[in-house]
């Protein structure tokens, strides 16, 4: 049965969902269309029961964009799609984070969602459509799932909110936020903004939620028409007696630990000891109590001897203890109050050869952040279905295993690292200088050296500080903070600057970055239903206060960006040349521009409009390159001095010197030296670089072309210049 339903999102944007035509052997499939952008999502969930010791939900979300969707060929030798791009990885995470909380607890069957873009009109981005398609595919399947979920993008143009703005509309929008949620609650946020207020942020979320409700209703209608019953599964539950025994053995000790402020390492060690001893005591107790006959008669009693189940129940006790300590007493694991920020320390300029650096430490989370400045040639070429551009601002985030005291794989960038780096990049990008004001390519690298929560927000703070240390003229400093939530019934507590345990055992991870004037980026993941807007408003206001506190600490370390670039950073100088002179600067096969680079140490980039950008770490090299270029495009003028190259020698006549591109002049034998010269080759050789002065220009009566008379002797007679090595025109 083919079902197709559509909804008008406003401004003539029709979103349609179709199922029953494609990929019918998958457990569920849905095709979503907006404009000419079409996304197919499929879902398959294994019916093979998971292993008894499995304690996680193996959900895999893949998002892939076909180049054929936009009528393009893939690059590279093989001409086919390769590994996922950064855009594809980020979109897969966007979908995963919104869907994962909606699967029922205890559902641990291997599940794979594949979202494929088969058509792109290069105007409507497919990312949020992929989230809708994935949810619709699950809803028409028999896979257990709580509620339909939808994702939308919200923009704001001239104060008016808009759902799913297209690529052109986003250019004029001051908000770009992706929202995922059910009809009842928001479960995922991610986006960037141009310093908007907390109230404006809340309004954008509410506006997006209205569209989400409509799209969810569309999915619910489809599911009702298909009326496919959900498959049954039996989550493993510990017997009541086992829970009682474990609580008796561990709760008091875990409570003592929770109320004792400890560093991460000590807490982990002592908690592991409680787990080990409780496990051992529980196994000994039930081995003595249960006989093989009892277990055979009531197989569920065997769970009392399952180490994995026992550890899960100890974890449940630990979670309960921490949550009640926060809700009932307003205390946290490290002794802080609910809105207290951990101690902050900042060191600047600690990496001598970097173009800017900062070591930002907040509690037991530490980021070493460096910046590198480059030219336009260093920009990253990005080719997606909707855009092809050069990216001149980037932030790369690295999370090595030693940062959490573990061993692990080194090399390659994981999805989590790409996601955290992207969030930090979007947070700072909003205050980065324009290309006109600062024509550098900027690369920020954040290496996490220690981690106990909020490492991505430490990267935001450290990245801002490194830019300021490097003299990059950012508009305003940016700081970031991670907020948490503990909610039981109507009682809740919002936590500022959460620890790793508070993230793991809590209900929300809400990262907010911004300046003193507003929010520049956010990311939120919710693990529970029923997050109302009052809680969200509280979290945003508490985040604002925390953000300002951190900004104050950063301002003490460095109030404004340094007045000059770092010693080893390249200096960029731009000059304009006539378009028809570009070929002269480049030379045959790039010979001339390579020669300038070799002689001056400067990197030279020429735009089609004649803009020449010169990058060099030394002022002398920059000046030499500028003067050489000016010389190359200048017209011969009597009295000017040039640095030329000997092209030919006539012993009894003189030397022919190329003093401008493709322009030779004669240095007569009498003009080579103040002393008498009998043989030119005794003084000059072909290829020599010599300074010459243009002393005369005469027309050849036969050809009508100019003949140039040059003198080395005239240069030697002049007073010595302060910069003898400077190439190019002197005396202009």
From Swiss-Prot:
Listed EC numbers: 2.7.7.8
SMART domains, per database record: KH, S1
Domain KH: 570-629
Residues given in the record as Mg(2+) binding sites: 503, 509
Region annotation (Disordered) ranges: 710-732
UniProt keyword Nuclease present: no
GO CC annotation: cytosol
Enzyme class per UniProt: transferase
GO biological process: mRNA catabolic process; RNA processing
Main location: cytoplasm
Feature: compositional bias, Basic and acidic residues: 715-732
Domain S1 motif: start-end pairs: 639-713
The protein's required cofactors: Mg(2+)
Pfam families noted in UniProt: KH_1, PNPase, RNase_PH, RNase_PH_C, S1
Subcellular localization, as worded in the UniProt entry: Cytoplasm
Alphabetized NCBIfam families for the sequence: polynuc_phos, PRK11824.1
Recorded family membership: Belongs to the polyribonucleotide nucleotidyltransferase family.
Protein task: Involved in mRNA degradation. Catalyzes the phosphorolysis of single-stranded polyribonucleotides processively in the 3'- to 5'-direction.
The protein's name in its UniProt record: Polyribonucleotide nucleotidyltransferase
Organism lineage: Bacteria, Pseudomonadati, Chlorobiota, Chlorobiia, Chlorobiales
């Amino acid at each position: 049965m083919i079902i197709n339903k559509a909804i008008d999102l406003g401004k003539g944007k029709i979103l349609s969902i179709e199922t029953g035509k494609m990929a019918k052997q998958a457990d569920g499939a849905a095709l979503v269309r907006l404009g000419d952008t079409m996304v197919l999502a499929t879902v398959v969930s294994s019916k093979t029961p998971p292993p008894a010791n499995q304690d996680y939900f193996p959900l895999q979300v893949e998002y892939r964009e076909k180049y054929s969707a936009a009528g393009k060929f893939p690059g590279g030798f093989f001409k086919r799609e390769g590994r996922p791009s950064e855009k594809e990885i980020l979109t897969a995470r966007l979908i995963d984070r919104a869907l994962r909380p909606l699967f029922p607890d205890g559902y641990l069957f291997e599940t794979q969602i594949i979202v494929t873009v088969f058509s792109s009109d290069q105007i409507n981005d497919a990312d949020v459509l992929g989230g809708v398609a994935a949810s619709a595919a699950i809803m028409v399947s028999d896979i257990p799932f709580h509620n339909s979920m939808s994702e939308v993008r919200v923009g704001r143009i001239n104060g008016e909110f808009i759902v799913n703005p297209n690529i052109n509309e986003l250019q004029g929008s001051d908000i770009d936020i992706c929202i995922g949620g059910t009809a009842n609650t928001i479960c995922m946020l991610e986006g960037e903004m141009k310093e908007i207020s907390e109230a404006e942020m809340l309004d954008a979320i509410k506006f997006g939620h209205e569209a989400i409700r409509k799209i969810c209703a569309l999915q619910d209608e489809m599911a009702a028409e298909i009326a496919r019953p959900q498959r049954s599964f039996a989550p493993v539950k510990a017997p009541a007696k086992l829970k009682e025994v474990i609580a008796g053995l561990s709760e008091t000790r875990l409570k003592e630990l929770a109320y004792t402020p400890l560093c991460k390492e000590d807490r982990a060690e002592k908690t592991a000891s409680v787990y080990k001893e409780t496990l051992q005591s529980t196994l000994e107790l039930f081995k003595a109590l249960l006989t093989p006959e009892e277990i055979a008669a009531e197989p569920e009693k065997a769970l009392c001897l399952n180490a994995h189940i026992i550890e899960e129940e100890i974890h449940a006790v630990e979670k309960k203890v921490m949550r009640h300590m926060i809700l009932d007493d307003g205390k946290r694991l490290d002794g802080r109050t609910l809105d207290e920020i951990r101690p902050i320390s900042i060191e600047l300029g600690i990496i001598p050869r970097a173009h800017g650096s900062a070591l930002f430490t907040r509690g037991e989370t530490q980021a070493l952040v460096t910046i590198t400045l480059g030219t336009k040639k260093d920009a990253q070429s990005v080719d997606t279905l909707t855009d092809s551009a050069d990216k001149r601002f980037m932030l790369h985030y690295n999370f090595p295993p030693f940062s959490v005291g573990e061993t692990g794989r080194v090399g390659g960038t994981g999805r989590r690292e790409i996601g955290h780096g992207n969030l930090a990049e979007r947070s700072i990008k909003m205050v980065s200088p324009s290309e006109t004001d600062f024509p550098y390519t900027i690369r920020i690298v954040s290496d996490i050296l220690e981690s106990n929560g909020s490492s991505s927000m430490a990267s935001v703070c450290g990245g801002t500080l490194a830019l300021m240390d490097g003299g990059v003229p950012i508009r305003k400093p940016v700081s970031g903070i991670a907020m948490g939530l503990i909610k039981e019934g109507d009682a809740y507590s919002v936590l500022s600057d959460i620890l790793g345990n508070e993230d793991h055992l809590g209900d929300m991870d809400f990262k907010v970055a911004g300046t003193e004037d507003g929010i520049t980026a956010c990311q939120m993941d919710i693990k529970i239903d029923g997050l109302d807007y009052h809680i969200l408003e509280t979290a945003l206001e508490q985040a604002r206060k925390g953000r300002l506190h951190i900004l104050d600490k950063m301002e003490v370390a460095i109030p404004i960006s340094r007045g000059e670039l770092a010693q080893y950073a390249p200096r960029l100088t731009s000059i304009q040349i006539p378009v028809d002179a570009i070929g002269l600067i480049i030379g045959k096969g790039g010979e001339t521009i390579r020669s300038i680079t070799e002689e001056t140490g400067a990197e030279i980039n020429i735009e089609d409009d004649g803009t020449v950008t010169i990058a060099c770490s030394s002022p002398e090299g920059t000046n030499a390159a500028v003067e050489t270029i000016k010389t190359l495009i200048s017209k011969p003028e009597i009295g000017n001095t040039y640095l030329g190259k000997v092209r030919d020698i006539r012993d009894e006549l003189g030397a022919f010197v190329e003093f401008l591109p493709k322009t030779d002049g004669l240095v007569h034998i009498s003009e080579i030296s103040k002393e008498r010269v009998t043989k030119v080759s005794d003084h000059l050789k072909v290829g020599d670089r010599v300074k010459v002065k243009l002393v005369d220009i005469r027309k050849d009566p036969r050809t009508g072309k100019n003949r140039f008379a040059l003198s080395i002797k005239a240069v030697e007679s002049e007073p010595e210049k302060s910069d003898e090595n400077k190439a190019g025109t002197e005396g202009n």
